[in-house]
Amino acid sequence: HGHHVFNSVENCPKPVIAAVNGFALGGGCELAMACHMRVAAENARFGQPEVKLGLIPGYGGTQRLPQLIGKSKAIELLMTADMLDAQEAYRLGLVNYVVPADQLMDKCREILQKIAVQAPVAIAEIVRTVNAHYDKTRDGFREEVERFGACFTTEDFKEGTDAFLNKRKAEFKGR
């Protein structure tokens, strides 16, 4: 049932950022990949070592890793059980930022503060439509069109438009 938990993280309508300090291996790496963004401390290490136990990742690692870093490199890492250091994870697109360990939580808060002033309904729809791209049972483009249209009916859209036209900061209510 772990995959249901990880899918819930991935589909959470509120932003979820993984703050990785140290090792994120196996399920820990899979949990980080389920988050919307990842911030790594300089000492972070990432890997999927399940093949050493005769297993494959069971909580979405075989799906999310190629989505994040590309098929060829993902297959290499899954088959060899090699680990990535924080800088390589950043270079490959697995993490959004690499910071000194003592700045890890501050960087996460900084990102969340930037997001917190945006329209909550639109943030939730971004999560939904981006994830639809990777869901083979859904048409990501159709989902985007439907959710885009739905945003026009929200109070947040009206507030955002009014704030823009009146050159003031929007005060979103999440409705």
Segment roles from a protein language model:
Residues 1-2, 157:
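Conserved donor sugar-nucleotide recognition element shared by glycan-biosynthetic enzymes
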Residues 122-128:
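Amphipathic alpha-helical segments used for helix-helix packing
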Residues 65-66, 126, 146-147, 172-174:
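A general structural signal for short secondary-structure boundary/capping elements
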Residues 7-121, 137, 154, 159-162, ...:
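Crotonase-fold acyl-CoA enzyme core
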Residues 2-6, 112, 130, 141-148:
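Hydrophobic alpha-helical core bundles mediating ligand binding, dimerization, or RNAP-core interactions
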Residues 132-133, 167-171:
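A short structural micro-motif
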Residues 77-78, 129-134, 147-152:
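Helix-loop "lid/cap" segments that line or gate small-molecule binding pockets
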